[in-house]
């Protein structure tokens, strides 16, 4: 990495680990960014795109990791959202997730919304104070069969 790069935007980041802890698959849908970029695991300089995630199925005991940060040399952080949907129930939304990790702000946002009573979804790890939003783990489980 070029030592002359402005790393401040890279300091605004989030890693979201979606873990299927149940026996039914779910899919990622509608992933989009308002600010920042998505990047490959462990490499903020290797940009990836929403199309790399949208439509991906996460099977039983599988994990998928979504990484996002601000763009280098830009005074912006990262902001985006995505849905997880049930492919066995007409792609009905399980939950909607929104994040914002703004550059130069004292507050971060992590907002899961929506409800699907067939699924249990729990999350932990979000840092709502200034700096990086951090690593958020989301456990997803379809109840029953």
From Swiss-Prot:
Presence of the UniProt keyword tRNA processing in the record: no
Stretch forming the signal peptide: none
Keyword check for Iron-sulfur: no
InterPro entries with a match to the protein in the record: Aegerolysin-typ (IPR009413)
Superkingdom of origin organism: Eukaryota
UniProt keyword annotations, A-Z: Cytolysis, Hemolysis
UniProt-listed GO biological process terms: symbiont-mediated hemolysis of host erythrocyte
Propeptide stretch(es), residue numbers: 1-8
Entry similarity comment: Belongs to the aegerolysin family.
Name of the protein: Aegerolysin Aa-Pri1
Organism expressing this protein natively: Cyclocybe aegerita
Gene name in the database record: AA-PRI1
């Amino acid at each position: 990495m070029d030592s002359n790069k402005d790393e401040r935007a890279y300091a605004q980041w989030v890693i979201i680990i979606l873990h299927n802890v149940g026996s039914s698959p779910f899919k990622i849908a509608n992933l989009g960014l308002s600010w920042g970029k998505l990047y490959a695991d462990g490499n903020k300089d290797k940009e990836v795109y929403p199309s790399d995630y949208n439509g991906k199925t996460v099977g039983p005991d599988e994990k998928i990791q979504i990484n996002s940060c601000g763009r280098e040399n830009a005074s912006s952080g990262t902001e985006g959202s995505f849905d997880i949907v049930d492919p066995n129930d007409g792609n009905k939304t399980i939950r909607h997730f929104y994040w914002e990790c703004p550059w130069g702000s004292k507050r971060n946002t992590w907002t899961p919304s929506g409800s699907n009573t067939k699924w249990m979804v729990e999350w932990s790890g979000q840092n709502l104070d200034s700096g990086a939003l951090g690593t958020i783990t989301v456990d997803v489980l379809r109840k029953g069969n």
